[in-house]
Amino acid sequence: MMKVPVENLGLFEQLDRIVVAFFKKQQSTSPYDLNISITQEHLDRKKQELEPLGYQAVQLPLGMALDNIMQQPHYKNLIIGGLAPDEIMVSKEELMSLKDIVDSFCIMYAAANNRLENSKAYELMKDKTVYFIGKLFTDIPKAGDEIAYLGIDRIASDGTPYEAVKCFLTEESAEKYNGEKRPVTPANLAYLKSFWGKPVIIEPHRNYWIEFL
């Protein structure tokens, strides 16, 4: 068993990866670890070990497995099998640094799979901080300040073209698509939408992207 700092695992890039998590069939009062398998070889081994002990294997996105750990008081650690030769353990406390990102992912994933209305998703996300490529007005404008954003061309259902503001859940995710090395700015989602008066699209390059018109 290895302990690896959560920031070294690159979990954000894998939030929509389908994994297998082992949940107890009976509600437990004593804390236990949540085991996750990401390879078939590890899954086969873990099934033999855990199913006789009353655990059930469930397929779900990694982000939802992380959400389970954060929301449920009876989990202690996350144990990931298949990423390295040894299993990796991450404490619940360390994972909590990802809580806001995981929460946003779960909202976006549910909306992308038609389990949550877009308007409800916006209500849940409007107060969150997102990152966009560009700048807003500052209190004291400096010479050379450029007020701008990186947009994406979209087509409405009636065929009308329009532009949406690209947003991201993390600064690192924004930088990944920032070829021109422009400033990356954090902003409240509702304020950003109001400031530009345009639709916003969050994580447009991922399968769970969401757009608020």
Segments (PLM) and residue ranges:
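An interfacial alpha-helical scaffold signature
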Residues: M1-L213
